[in-house]
Amino acid sequence: MTTLKIDPHKSWIPLREKADEISNEKHKILLNEVANHMEAEIKGQLDPLMNTLTAEPVYHFWRVSDVNMILNGYEEVSSFYSNMFQNGGEQFEVVTKRIIVNDDGVITEGKVKQVYTKDNLKLMGVTTDTFSEIDNSNLWLSNTQLITVWPSDPDLKLVGEDIYFGENPMETLKPINEDEIPDYYKIN
């Protein structure tokens, strides 16, 4: 049996385990809220995901490209996720190595892995000029350093996300085979 190189449905397990280990009820709720958010996002469930957020969430994506991205408010965040789900972008795995929780929120640190088809990479502007190996495989796996700050409000709802990428995901691409991804994964 081939070992899976990506398994998105394992992403929220470390958060649930950390919540089970601690006694502070507020921290337990915050950890489970982040886990609920992550699970809904990775499973493409918009309403449960948005229910974890405040009425006016704010997202910051740092070092996604040459331009950082900011999403302000319910409509922008909801639209972002709707577009992500339509394009299969929710199918990623967060491999969490460290979790920090306090009364103000949660911080997760680790890696984020995502599979891209050769055709999707080309639609994203990747060419043989920018990535000479693109035509060598139909499927590619990125594996990028990620820190996410999950601030919360006094009602223990998530205010949004501050997402810091340690590197450009396109610079970490490695070929992957179909038998190295879970059966539930949809290749778009």
State each model region's role.
Residues 1-188:
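C-terminal and inter-domain tail/linker signature
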